[in-house]
């Protein structure tokens, strides 16, 4: 396995004293070069849909930090836009979408096969990255999981408790299930095209999985992930897949096996020693440093990074954060992190 890229070795089940490292949102506003390129693009969505500039911001943290993986620069809400939803971003507030709250909203949506015209620039970005990344760097594609994407499509924005989505799920299950099926089908096609374009790994982000409890979690977080992963694996048998059902709590146990994922990403609420005992037995674990420490820096950052590394080095581990790096993080703290992990 020594000839494989380091991240792929972890995904294949190899334990290492020094794990591969990448960070969620590693291409982002904490980097001055990102801010300059985003200004050049004009706005966030224009950056996402410009293959040359999107590839540039994806490559920036690789040049600066030599991470073991590079994740495509895009957004989980490009699928709703490709399906026919209006999408725009409000400065300082985040995304806004036209809402789907009933059957008439669903009737306006395109089919899963109609998304590629909108999303072709994303596939072009992947093709550029597959050519330009260093040979030792793994290219990760991604999409939002159906439940998380649905919460935005129903509410028209991010919501702290996902109440509008829960209301539709309980009050009009027929419309809700149709929406979930459509997003699931579109996600399969989107990720399939990313892999065809050159993505070596894909990750499924279910940022709001933790708001689903009991049977609802199994139906709307676990089952769609299983369907997506099963279909992708049928088309690409050797494709490694990372699943991130954020804040799943005890539902993390057995999740990777249940959905067929090669790696389970965990949030900051999970203790690394507990993860080693309860999750790493199923395969690779990714995580899970608190992003706040990327702002704090210093020995607090270095010692916690070493603690997580050492707790999980008995099995396959990809070092990452428990959530995305924040705009107020100091880029110099990334060097502190990498020195701590790699020393």
Swiss-Prot record:
Amino-acid positions noted as binding substrate in the UniProt annotation, renumbered to this chain: 25-29, 75, 152, 207, 323
UniProt xrefs under InterPro entries: UROD/MetE-like_sf, Uroporphyrinogen_deCO2ase_HemE, Uroporphyrinogen_deCOase
A Pfam family: URO-D
EC number: 4.1.1.37
GO molecular function: uroporphyrinogen decarboxylase activity
One GO term (biological process): protoporphyrinogen IX biosynthetic process from glutamate
Lineage, top ranks: Bacteria, Pseudomonadati, Pseudomonadota, Alphaproteobacteria, Rhodobacterales
Biochemical pathway: Porphyrin-containing compound metabolism; protoporphyrin-IX biosynthesis; coproporphyrinogen-III from 5-aminolevulinate: step 4/4
Catalytic activity: uroporphyrinogen III + 4 H(+) = coproporphyrinogen III + 4 CO2
The protein's assembly and partners: Homodimer.
Recorded family membership: Belongs to the uroporphyrinogen decarboxylase family.
Principal subcellular localisation of the protein: cytoplasm
Purpose: Catalyzes the decarboxylation of four acetate groups of uroporphyrinogen-III to yield coproporphyrinogen-III.
UniProt-annotated location(s): Cytoplasm
Entry keyword set: Cytoplasm, Decarboxylase, Lyase, Porphyrin biosynthesis
Site (Transition state stabilizer): 75
Protein name per UniProt: Uroporphyrinogen decarboxylase
GO cellular component, one term: cytosol
């Amino acid at each position: 396995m020594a000839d494989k890229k380091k991240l792929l070795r972890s995904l294949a089940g190899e334990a290492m004293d020094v794990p591969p490292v990448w960070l969620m949102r590693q291409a982002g506003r904490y980097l001055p070069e990102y801010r300059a390129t985003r200004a050049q693009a004009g706005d966030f969505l224009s950056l996402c849909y410009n293959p040359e500039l999107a590839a540039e911001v994806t490559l920036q943290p690789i040049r600066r930090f030599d991470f073991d993986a590079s994740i495509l620069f895009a957004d989980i809400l490009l699928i709703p836009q490709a399906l026919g939803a209006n999408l725009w971003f409000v400065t300082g507030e985040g995304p806004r979408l036209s809402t789907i709250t009933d059957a008439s909203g669903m009737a306006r949506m395109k089919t899963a096969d109609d998304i590629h015209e909108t999303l072709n620039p994303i596939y072009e970005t992947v093709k550029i990255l597959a050519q330009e990344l260093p040979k030792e760097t793994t290219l990760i594609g991604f999409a939002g999981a159906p439940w998380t994407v649905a919460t935005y499509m129903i509410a028209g924005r991010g919501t702290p408790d996902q109440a509008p989505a829960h209301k539709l799920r309980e009050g009009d299950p027929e419309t809700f299930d149709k929406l979930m099926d459509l997003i699931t089908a579109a996600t399969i096609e989107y990720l399939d095209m990313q892999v065809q374009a050159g993505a070596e790994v894909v990750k499924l982000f279910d940022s709001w999985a933790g708001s689903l409890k009991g049977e609802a979690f199994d139906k709307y977080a676990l089952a769609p992930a299983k369907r997506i992963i099963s279909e992708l694996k049928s088309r690409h048998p050797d494709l490694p897949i990372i699943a991130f059902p954020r804040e799943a709590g005890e539902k993390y146990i057995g999740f990777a096996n249940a959905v067929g994922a090669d790696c389970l990403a965990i949030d900051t609420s999970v203790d690394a020693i507990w993860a080693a005992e309860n999750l790493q037995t199923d395969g690779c674990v990714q995580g899970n440093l608190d992003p706040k420490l990327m702002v704090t820096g210093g020995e607090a950052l270095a010692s916690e990074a070493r603690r997580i590394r050492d707790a999980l080095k008995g099995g396959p581990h990809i070092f990452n954060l428990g959530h995305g790096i924040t705009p107020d993080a100091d880029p110099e703290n990334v060097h502190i992190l990498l020195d701590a992990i790699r020393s």
